[in-house]
Amino acid sequence: MKNLAVITGGSGGIGSAIAKVLIPQGYSVVLSGRNEARLAEVVSQLKQQFHDASITAVAADLSEETGRGALLDHVAASPTPLSLVINNAGAGLFGLFEDIPPSELQRVFNINVTAPMLFTQAVLKRLGSAGADLQIINIGSTFGTIGYPGFAGYCATKFALRGWSEALDREYSGSAIRIRYFAPRATRTELNTDAVNAMNEALGVTMDSAEAVAREFSTFLSGRRHSAHIGWPERFFVWLNKVLPNVVSSALAKQVPVIKEYASKR
């Protein structure tokens, strides 16, 4: 085996799809997730497909210190050196901002931002000084660069994740550690509510499969770029939002009535 890869949110669509592209590259894989039964099911499916692969799992809530510790202990006990951490675990949040309960805003921020930050900090303290190359890749979103109505709380988490990734990568410049950021566009996963799926269809939003995202991730992993956004025209709008944000605001304003309609059904 090449090296060890840890995938948080490993029981979900994108996490398990990424595992399927890493295993043929020689990685031993550790999957982490909160749903123990679902995690066991994913591991069983992967082992049926990849008979000789090293695939293990840790059921853990990474928003809790005990969960982070359990995953880190498992990784530290492996004879295979850690070379890749993929912070993929996350939660969606759709709705008009004033309608979202404060507890829900706090819960999603903890899952999407605080948990990956604290787990990464623990990895760096305990395993990051071994001198071996280590990549930490944070899975973000197009909504980490473009503020989108109906997703204000979710955007806040992904903007935070992107900024932290950029700052931390610069903090480790000149070392063997890299922190990178990979941003899918809308993806068909169980994180989407029925209202989100219906709204995307009404707006003509292209949604990628988890497998397509994983293929793009594999390409990104083999390169050297700090960050990548996938999908067209999303990449164009990411650029446009940087140079002419008012143009993007005008375009999105036309979608607000539809967004409000589906937000009321969330």
Q: Where are each of the predicted segments found?
A:
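Residue(s) in the substrate-gating loop at a strand-loop-helix junction
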Residues: 141
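Active-site helix of classical SDR
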Residues: 120, 157
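Conserved NAD(P)H cofactor-binding loop of Rossmann-fold oxidoreductase domains
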Residues: 88-93
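C-terminal helical subdomain
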Residues: 181, 201-238
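Substrate-binding pocket helix/loop in short-chain dehydrogenase/reductase
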Residues: 96-97, 101-107
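Conserved glycine-rich Rossmann-like NAD(P)H-binding loop of the short-chain dehydrogenase/reductase
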Residues: 25-42
